Amino acid sequence: MAIRKYKPTTPGLRGSSVADFAEITRSTPEKSLLRPLHKTGGRNNTGRITTRHKGGGHKRQYRLVDFRRHDKDGVPATVAHIEYDPNRTARIALLHYADGAKRYILAPAKLKQGDVVEAGPNADIKPGNNLPMRNIPVGTTIHAVELRPGGGAKMARSAGASVQLVAREGKYAQLRLPSGEIRNVDVRCRATIGEVGNAEQSNINWGKAGRMRWKGVRPTVRGVVMNPVDHPHGGGEGKTSGGRHPVNRNGKPEGRTRRPNKESDKLIVRRRRTGKNKR
């Protein structure tokens, strides 16, 4: 993938860029793998906004991506097409299995049309193949990692993401995550070889607010510029800093939202670096 930059012929195009989609081989998705996708506008079942900054955006259809490839062990599949998916940053690959089935998977870097991929404990160590971590050599870069055996891929699924298998001790494999965290995962869990493709996606400059609206992202308005009726930080004469610790619109403290006593925290060997520890 490469990034195409626009000439500054208008204010919205100044500095903006777009993916060149050179790796895409087909523009129409596989119809049997499509499902309707209904927008919520950030509202819950009572109609109240539970997630701000959501709404609008282009109409989409959901592509059924196979994050659980256990049922196709030992069945080779040919990469028929690399396709665009509006619901994620990564590209997706359409596989035609030898038994006639068709499935989508996340397209790893360097996977191209015509390649043959396979799942199962005896699969080769090459991009796109899916194996249990007990069968993957230490030091291998992987993605689409399960957290529970048979639970489907949960980690390292966005564009350019990857995890490194750094050690294996007993029934656990140690993984180095993109955040720097080192975590134990059951060796029976599966992962796909290679890193997710479309890594240059993070370098795209969207250029104008309108392109974000196409994606369904609404403006983010700071609380300190609102009125007191709208936000606890609102009001004051002139520009003010809010005068209190950051809170949301309901007055609940912002930041540090992760649970400190999550059951799976015992599997963390080394925590990710945060704040001043990032240096």
Swiss-Prot record:
The annotated regions of Basic residues compositional bias extend over 269-279
What do the Gene Ontology cellular component annotations say? large ribosomal subunit
> Which domain of life, per UniProt?
Bacteria
List the molecular function annotations (GO) for this entry: rRNA binding; structural constituent of ribosome; transferase activity
UniProt region (Disordered), positions on chain: 34-58, 225-279
Show the InterPro entries listed in the entry: NA-bd_OB-fold (IPR012340), Rib_uL2_dom2 (IPR014722), Ribosomal_uL2 (IPR002171), Ribosomal_uL2_bac/org-type (IPR005880), Ribosomal_uL2_C (IPR022669), Ribosomal_uL2_CS (IPR022671), Ribosomal_uL2_dom3 (IPR014726), Ribosomal_uL2_RNA-bd_dom (IPR022666)
Tell me any Pfam family this protein matches.
Ribosomal_L2
Q: Does the keyword Magnesium apply?
A: no
Q: Which UniProt keywords apply?
A: Ribonucleoprotein, Ribosomal protein, RNA-binding, rRNA-binding
Q: What SMART domains does the entry give? A: Ribosomal_L2, Ribosomal_L2_C
* Comp. bias intervals (Basic and acidic residues): 251-268
Q: Which GO biological-process labels does this protein carry? A: cytoplasmic translation
Q: What family is it from?
A: Belongs to the universal ribosomal protein uL2 family.
Cited HAMAP family: Ribosomal_uL2_B (MF_01320_B)
Note the PANTHER family from the entry: LARGE RIBOSOMAL SUBUNIT PROTEIN UL2M (PTHR13691:SF5), RIBOSOMAL PROTEIN L2 (PTHR13691)
On subunit structure and binding partners, the annotation says: Part of the 50S ribosomal subunit. Forms a bridge to the 30S subunit in the 70S ribosome.
Purpose: One of the primary rRNA binding proteins. Required for association of the 30S and 50S subunits to form the 70S ribosome, for tRNA binding and peptide bond formation. It has been suggested to have peptidyltransferase activity; this is somewhat controversial. Makes several contacts with the 16S rRNA in the 70S ribosome.
Protein name from the UniProt record: Large ribosomal subunit protein uL2
Species whose genome carries this gene: Micrococcus luteus (strain ATCC 4698 / DSM 20030 / JCM 1464 / CCM 169 / CCUG 5858 / IAM 1056 / NBRC 3333 / NCIMB 9278 / NCTC 2665 / VKM Ac-2230)
